[in-house]
Amino acid sequence: MVKKNNSNKKTNNKKTNNKKTNNKKTNNKKTNNKKTAIIVIICAIISVFVFAMMLTSNSETSVSSTKTIPTMSDYVDNLSNSHTYFIPQTNSIFDHFLTYNDFTRYHNGNPSPNDGIRITFNESYDTQSILDLKPNDGTVVIYPVFTSAAYKTPGFYDYYAGKCDETCVTDISFENPEFQFTSSGASAQILYLLGYDFLTDIHVDKNPEILEKYDTVILLHNEYVTKKEFDAISNHPNLIFLNPNALYAEIDVNYDDNTMTLIRGHDYPPENPVANGFGYAIEEKFHEYEYELECLDWKFVEIENGFHLNCYPESIIVNNLEILKKMKEL
């Protein structure tokens, strides 16, 4: 009887132990399932977060990429809308148009426009002469948007003249450039009318490699440029400087609000003044010709990577298209 009881006891103990083991396995399995579920949930949350970030990034990139850069055509269209008042000229090549304010000033005896001029070819001008001046393939002109901004008031030149502090060289808007004498307004319009391809400072600064598409790059009075723009232009193998004083001073730009700030050059900064902000030998060599306005002995001088005109032609180019004819032959 004792042996039988012991046997039953062992059997009961074994069943109890097996039940405990099974319960333990079941509990472990439930615990593991919970851990797995938690991990899956965390991974799902992370995945959703990453996906949302990617969508946001793509959205921002899309907005940025679709933000168009104003072109020369845009600027000329604006000029056509603002300069609508015709004034007669003895010049048989171009017709001139002014803004209303300048037109009023003109008839009050002040012929010097504040807002620049718009020019178009006179209908009587020889068509063949225009065709002869059409650009060579692979040529582009860079319109000096930044320089136009620098010469506005209040601006850089108010600072140089001691009329204001460094706020006049800091965060200056470069929107709405003007076709003035100081920004090669007439030269730019003539080249545009002749069919030259145009980029602006902004195009080159944002995408310096764009100049590699062109065989020849023509500079106007691109006095103020960024370091990226300077590097892209100065390293191009075939430049034509239609104006002295190009690539003279370094600026920084902020495309969030379309402003620019003077960094170096034009005897700035005051604690370490320098003339050419880039130490650019070609500009330094031809700098004195900036004030040669009559261009009586004009010529294109060969430089290591192109040619440089030895005068500032803005005053006379509307009457002397021979300069552009010679430029085309270079």
Feature annotation, model-predicted:
Residues 69-209, 284-288, 292-330:
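Aromatic-Pro/Gly-enriched surface loop or interdomain linker
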Residues 29-44, 54:
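N-terminal Sec-pathway targeting helices
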Residues 177-253:
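Helical hinge/lid and interdomain linker segments adjacent to catalytic or ligand-binding clefts
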Residues 45-51, 137-140:
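Transmembrane alpha-helices
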Residues 56-73:
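Ser/Thr/Pro/Gly-rich low-complexity linker/stalk segments immediately outside membranes or between
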Residues 75, 94, 141-146, 220-221, ...:
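Intrinsic-disorder/low-complexity accessory segments
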Residues 223-306:
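A glycine-rich, often tryptophan-bearing local segment used as a flexible ligand/cofactor-contacting loop or short
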Residues 1-33:
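N-terminal Lys/Arg-rich, disordered targeting/topogenic segments
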